[in-house]
Amino acid sequence: MENNKTSVDSKSINNFEVKTIHGSKSVDSGIYLDSSYKMDYPEMGICIIINNKNFHKSTGMSSRSGTDVDAANLRETFMGLKYQVRNKNDLTREDILELMDSVSKEDHSKRSSFVCVILSHGDEGVIYGTNGPVELKKLTSFFRGDYCRSLTGKPKLFIIQACRGTELDCGIETDSGTDEEMACQKIPVEADFLYAYSTAPGYYSWRNSKDGSWFIQSLCSMLKLYAHKLEFMHILTRVNRKVATEFESFSLDSTFHAKKQIPCIVSMLTKELYFYH
């Protein structure tokens, strides 16, 4: 149970559009593809860590104490998984877009996967550069299958430590018991993405000033324990449980005291993901 100073990673909201597609057909690929991603390329891949701590005064956003602990923990964890880690600090929204564009244009053909971690303030659908918001969808679109061909069919993981709104979770007491590939196979451009959000849609995300955020602490801990034993979704389920059961906010302000948090995983992965082979 955490009892140090806790903070949140919050800010503004955006509309989104719903499109309806009429008609469909069944497609038989003619081949039973491997059930897990090929992870034995010469390189595991790049892991970008965007760590935004200090924000322009015009944004009205506070400094994110504890985020450097997260960045260091993530660097150690993903280097241990053989990723090429690139730490980027205090990027403006323009810097972030330029970085994503640049990395997406690299040749990833000898890399097994791609990881991007964003530590910042946020709200539903947006994260904050040091000078203002940028849509998360705009950042991830650079890595779609039709734009970044050398990552097509490979896992692209986006890990987001940021608020997704201003709701607070008070918690509730429980009463419970104890490849072979086909040359011309077509896949959706949004396939093979996974988004690991620190909190559920609409909610605050908590961060400890000394130990870092609840989510990143838990993610790194579970990866170090299970990355060479379990499939990634199973690891993330353990992360969810750890955050949900082992953390609670402590604040002198009763509005923010004794609050809970649950991470949210959105997966468009099409195969199982193991960090070992």
Swiss-Prot record:
<dbReference type="GO" id="GO:0044877">
    <property type="term" value="F:protein-containing complex binding"/>
</dbReference>
<dbReference type="GO" id="GO:0007611">
    <property type="term" value="P:learning or memory"/>
</dbReference>
<dbReference type="GO" id="GO:1902004">
    <property type="term" value="P:positive regulation of amyloid-beta formation"/>
</dbReference>
<dbReference type="GO" id="GO:0004861">
    <property type="term" value="F:cyclin-dependent protein serine/threonine kinase inhibitor activity"/>
</dbReference>
<dbReference type="GO" id="GO:0004175">
    <property type="term" value="F:endopeptidase activity"/>
</dbReference>
<dbReference type="GO" id="GO:0007605">
    <property type="term" value="P:sensory perception of sound"/>
</dbReference>
<comment type="subunit">
    <text>Heterotetramer that consists of two anti-parallel arranged heterodimers, each one formed by a 17 kDa (p17) and a 12 kDa (p12) subunit. Interacts with BIRC6/bruce.</text>
</comment>
<keyword id="KW-0788">Thiol protease</keyword>
<dbReference type="GO" id="GO:0005737">
    <property type="term" value="C:cytoplasm"/>
</dbReference>
<dbReference type="GO" id="GO:0098693">
    <property type="term" value="P:regulation of synaptic vesicle cycle"/>
</dbReference>
<dbReference type="Pfam" id="PF00656">
    <property type="entry name" value="Peptidase_C14"/>
</dbReference>
<dbReference type="GO" id="GO:0043200">
    <property type="term" value="P:response to amino acid"/>
</dbReference>
<dbReference type="GO" id="GO:0046007">
    <property type="term" value="P:negative regulation of activated T cell proliferation"/>
</dbReference>
<keyword id="KW-0702">S-nitrosylation</keyword>
<comment type="similarity">
    <text>Belongs to the peptidase C14A family.</text>
</comment>
<dbReference type="GO" id="GO:0005829">
    <property type="term" value="C:cytosol"/>
</dbReference>
<keyword id="KW-0832">Ubl conjugation</keyword>
<feature type="propeptide">
    <location>
        <begin position="1"/>
        <end position="9"/>
    </location>
</feature>
<dbReference type="GO" id="GO:0043525">
    <property type="term" value="P:positive regulation of neuron apoptotic process"/>
</dbReference>
<feature type="active site">
    <location>
        <position position="121"/>
    </location>
</feature>
<dbReference type="InterPro" id="IPR016129">
    <property type="entry name" value="Caspase_his_AS"/>
</dbReference>
<dbReference type="GO" id="GO:0031264">
    <property type="term" value="C:death-inducing signaling complex"/>
</dbReference>
<dbReference type="GO" id="GO:0001782">
    <property type="term" value="P:B cell homeostasis"/>
</dbReference>
<dbReference type="GO" id="GO:0016485">
    <property type="term" value="P:protein processing"/>
</dbReference>
<dbReference type="GO" id="GO:0043025">
    <property type="term" value="C:neuronal cell body"/>
</dbReference>
<dbReference type="GO" id="GO:0005634">
    <property type="term" value="C:nucleus"/>
</dbReference>
<dbReference type="GO" id="GO:0007413">
    <property type="term" value="P:axonal fasciculation"/>
</dbReference>
<dbReference type="GO" id="GO:0030218">
    <property type="term" value="P:erythrocyte differentiation"/>
</dbReference>
<dbReference type="GO" id="GO:0070059">
    <property type="term" value="P:intrinsic apoptotic signaling pathway in response to endoplasmic reticulum stress"/>
</dbReference>
<dbReference type="GO" id="GO:0043029">
    <property type="term" value="P:T cell homeostasis"/>
</dbReference>
<dbReference type="GO" id="GO:0009749">
    <property type="term" value="P:response to glucose"/>
</dbReference>
<dbReference type="GO" id="GO:0005123">
    <property type="term" value="F:death receptor binding"/>
</dbReference>
<dbReference type="GO" id="GO:0009611">
    <property type="term" value="P:response to wounding"/>
</dbReference>
<dbReference type="GO" id="GO:0009411">
    <property type="term" value="P:response to UV"/>
</dbReference>
<dbReference type="GO" id="GO:0051384">
    <property type="term" value="P:response to glucocorticoid"/>
</dbReference>
<dbReference type="GO" id="GO:0051402">
    <property type="term" value="P:neuron apoptotic process"/>
</dbReference>
<dbReference type="GO" id="GO:0098978">
    <property type="term" value="C:glutamatergic synapse"/>
</dbReference>
<dbReference type="GO" id="GO:0043065">
    <property type="term" value="P:positive regulation of apoptotic process"/>
</dbReference>
<keyword id="KW-0645">Protease</keyword>
<dbReference type="GO" id="GO:0042542">
    <property type="term" value="P:response to hydrogen peroxide"/>
</dbReference>
<dbReference type="InterPro" id="IPR001309">
    <property type="entry name" value="Pept_C14_p20"/>
</dbReference>
<dbReference type="GO" id="GO:0097194">
    <property type="term" value="P:execution phase of apoptosis"/>
</dbReference>
